């Protein structure tokens, strides 16, 4: 599962670098496609190499991938926070979506969705210390379930 998640994250990263649709701003320091609010159409899915991909980046995708792609994700985090700052970062963290191809002032969806904010917090902590994964894996119910499924240490 870890390797599959890493591969999926790297697909997003490489897609943004290749940028086949020529969207402004996408690249090594701006990638991450998933369901989120969108400055053009409201809440929708953004998937690489589909009609739904319109240049909108969902910060949660790259930020939440930090355990799988630490260098690539940290590049996005630094770019969003230090270079774009208040354009993409608000009181509760990164806004839900950003599309650099749009007119300034219309590029950012200034919403905070729990389904997008929550994974960022948890995965940053897992990257930092492994805390949440470690607590989860020590729960007796989880150990029992894994044992019943044939998993061994």
Where are these regions (language model features)?
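Ser/Thr/Asn(+Pro)-rich, low-complexity disordered segments
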Residues: 1-153
């Amino acid at each position: 599962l870890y390797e599959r998640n890493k591969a999926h994250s790297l697909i997003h990263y490489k897609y943004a670098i290749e940028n086949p649709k020529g969207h402004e701003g996408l690249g090594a320091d701006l990638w991450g496609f998933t369901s989120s609010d969108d400055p053009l159409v409201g809440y929708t899915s953004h998937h690489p190499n589909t009609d739904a991909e319109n240049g909108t980046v969902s910060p949660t995708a790259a930020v939440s991938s930090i355990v799988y792609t630490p260098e690539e994700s940290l590049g996005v985090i630094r770019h969003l926070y230090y270079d774009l700052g208040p354009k993409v970062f608000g009181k509760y963290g990164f806004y839900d979506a950003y599309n650099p191809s749009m007119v300034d002032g219309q590029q950012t969806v200034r919403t905070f969705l729990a389904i997008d904010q929550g994974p960022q917090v948890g995965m940053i902590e897992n990257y930092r210390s492994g805390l949440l994964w470690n607590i989860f894996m020590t729960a007796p119910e989880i150990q029992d379930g894994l044992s019943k499924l044939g998993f061994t240490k």
